Regions:
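A conserved SF2-helicase RecA2
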Residues: 345-412
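Walker B catalytic acidic pair
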Residues: 2-3
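Short, structured coil segments at secondary-structure junctions
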Residues: 25, 292-293, 334-335
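Conserved Helicase C-terminal RecA-like lobe
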Residues: 118-135, 143-329, 400-412
Length: 412
């Protein structure tokens, strides 16, 4: 399995089905990736178990894997090492990450290299930008009150972080209801939707065959409640009937509300003055940059790969991290500069993103990457990614681009 990192999350339907296939067919398994571990030993343990079986450097018992994860994964409050202290003694290492690295690379069947495939260097620096007073004020109010500028109250920390990152880019998303449904109906719709999604999340934790994705669960609930004939399993969902009764009675759209497009204007300015790629995570932001700069926007959809690979490097482009930031080969032949306008917080996402230009076929001696880190949310995202990359390099031994790059803003 090439791109083994796509199978590292056991909670996805894809990985669940793949692991069931391996278990049912007793297949021999090989995999490789530069970002296999992500940010947890749990990301590689199940794949190692199928590939190496009793020779795996990780525990075969999932409960013990969880214990290792709590003690070894990057965390401000790791669990005590407990029995893992013996690994420090056995390897002669002083840090548990290094001890685990020795255990992994010395296990028969594991191939690890520290050699890079490209001689070009990487330079990462901050692109400074002045934050308008209106953005600073809006972000301060958001952090204090957990209320969006339009009065919407946020309910959890993940939602708060998402909105703060949007507002740092100058806007936020909201749902609108253009058909004018009554507020009481919209509220009932929200409650039914919330109950259904919560029940689905709980059910998915068990990852049962034919019940391992939201779509399959909806079909199983329909078979139970509506009596649809099938040999497939059913699911006696408590919330399904309430949800389907009201599901189609409310129509909503996402709308971007701009506070100040200062960051999009700055990214467009960079794109016009240089020849490179502006990477984005938020669709509204990417669209605004492309419009301001008068350059192509490369998102997803049918034909997306052909369209972006048809570029010849005679102009800057705006590209989606989700659609083109992983696995896309060919951009390195035409570009050596990039601006990460909405920086990811995942070390593995950065590894893949930097690898779009820093790879075999890059004719320049240096790949230059600029990134915004003008708010705590943006700075924390990059700092967290660097922390994860250091952990992955320490445990897995694979050189991480965030670690080998010259990161200017970290220089004292």
């Amino acid at each position: 399995a090439d791109e083994g990192h796509k199978l590292r999350n056991k909670d996805t339907a894809r990985t669940g089905r793949f692991l069931r296939y391996l278990a049912q067919h007793n297949a021999r398994f090989f995999t490789w990736s530069g970002t296999l571990f992500g940010s947890s030993v749990k990301h590689g343990a199940h794949l190692s178990a199928f590939a190496l079986r009793e020779g795996s450097p990780f525990p075969l018992d999932p409960d013990v894997v969880d214990e290792w994860s709590a003690a070894i994964d990057p965390s401000d409050n790791p669990a005590p090492l407990g029995p893992l202290q013996r690994l420090l003694v056995a390897t002669g290492e002083g840090e548990i990450e290094r001890a685990l690295h020795v255990r992994i690379v010395e296990s028969p069947g594991v191939v690890s290299t520290k050699e890079g495939a490209i001689d070009a260097s990487i330079l990462i620096d901050e692109r400074a930008v002045t934050v308008p007073a209106g953005i600073n004020e809006a972000l301060t109010n958001l952090r204090k009150t957990w209320v969006r500028p339009d009065g919407e109250e946020l309910v959890d920390a993940l939602e708060l972080a998402r909105v703060a990152r949007e507002m740092a880019a100058g806007f936020y998303y909201r749902w609108i209801f253009p058909k004018g449904e009554p507020d009481s109906l919209i509220e009932a719709w929200f409650q039914a939707r919330k109950a259904w999604h919560k029940e689905v999340r709980e059910k998915l934790k068990r990852r049962e065959p034919h019940l391992d994705s939201p779509l399959l669960l909806a079909k199983a609930a329909a078979r139970y409640h509506l009596g649809e004939p099938s040999d497939l399993p059913t699911w006696a969902s408590d919330s399904y009937l309430d949800w389907i009764e009201i599901r189609d009675s409310v129509y909503h759209e996402s709308e971007a509300v701009w506070i100040d497009d200062y960051l999009a204007r700055d990214a467009a300015k960079w794109a016009c003055e240089n020849r490179g790629i502006v990477w984005y995570q938020h669709g509204a932001f990417g669209q605004r940059v492309a419009e301001l700069a008068g350059i192509p926007l490369h998102g997803g959809g049918i034909g997306a790969e052909d369209r972006i690979l048809a570029e010849r490097g005679d102009r800057s482009i705006v590209a989606s991290i989700k659609s083109h930031g992983t696995g896309r080969d060919g951009l390195q032949r035409f570009f050596s500069e990039q601006l990460v306008s909405n920086p990811p917080s995942s070390g593995s996402d950065w590894e893949q993103l930097l690898g779009r230009l820093h790879r075999i076929g890059q004719p320049r001696d240096e790949v230059v990457t600029l990134a915004y880190r003008h708010t705590p949310e943006y700075a924390d995202a990059i700092d967290n990614a660097i922390k994860q990359a250091r952990w992955v390099q320490g445990v897995g031994g694979n050189l991480q681009k965030l670690c080998t790059a010259s990161v200017i803003f970290l220089t004292p």
